[in-house]
């Protein structure tokens, strides 16, 4: 059975997640190397799918897959509902079980029952990310937001 390069990229990433459950994400090279070891495949399309074609937040060019999440520069993990998605991406999130060898179908089951139900990575809401975001807010708007927060803190809960 010939496996689509997008499915190879997803399967290699899923295998890494299962083999390293404490790892949040993996380098592009780690995923490519895992795909090569598993599938003995050197098709350049696998690399392109890891880098761009399967990344949900990227503009589709041409693929619309939502199989991977770009968690940081040069890092990927499997996509989870709630991750950022480019509005033009409507493609598949995981391989069709009938299109992959039987020995990998349990990875799709694991993804659906466990992985996809976990919340998106906490790294996206880390203090450093929030501080970087706050740094983008104009000072005037930041003062208004701070005042609104202070006003809300003075609300008497007995009034509700």
PLM feature segments, named:
Residues 1-19, 41-121, 155, 159:
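Phospho-regulated, low-complexity intrinsically disordered regions of nuclear gene-regulatory
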Residues 21-22, 40-44, 139-142:
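Alpha-helix boundary/capping and short turn/kink residues
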Residues 30-32:
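A short acidic, leucine-rich amphipathic alpha-helix
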Residues 26-27, 45-46, 125, 144:
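Alpha-helix N-cap and coil->helix boundary residues
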Residues 17-27:
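Short capping segments at the starts of secondary-structure elements
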Residues 34, 38:
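Residues within the alpha-helical elements of helix-turn-helix
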Residues 121-152:
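Short interaction-prone segments
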Residues 2-9, 28, 126-130:
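Onset of an N-terminal alpha helix
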């Amino acid at each position: 059975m010939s496996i689509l390069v997008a499915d190879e990229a997803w399967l290699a990433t899923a295998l890494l997640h299962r083999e390293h459950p404490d790892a949040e994400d993996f380098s592009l090279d780690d995923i490519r190397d895992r795909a090569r070891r598993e599938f003995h495949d050197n098709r350049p399309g696998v690399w392109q799918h890891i880098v761009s074609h399967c990344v949900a937040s990227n503009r589709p060019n041409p693929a619309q897959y939502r199989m991977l999440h770009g968690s940081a520069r040069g890092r990927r993990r499997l996509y989870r509902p709630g991750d950022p998605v480019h509005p033009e991406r409507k493609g598949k999130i995981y391989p069709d079980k009938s299109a992959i060898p039987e020995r990998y179908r349990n990875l799709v089951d694991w993804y659906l029952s466990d992985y996809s139900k976990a919340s998106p990575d906490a790294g996206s809401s880390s203090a450093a990310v929030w501080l970087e975001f706050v740094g983008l807010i104009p000072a005037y708007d930041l003062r208004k937001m701070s005042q609104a927060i202070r006003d809300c803190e003075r609300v008497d809960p007995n009034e509700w």
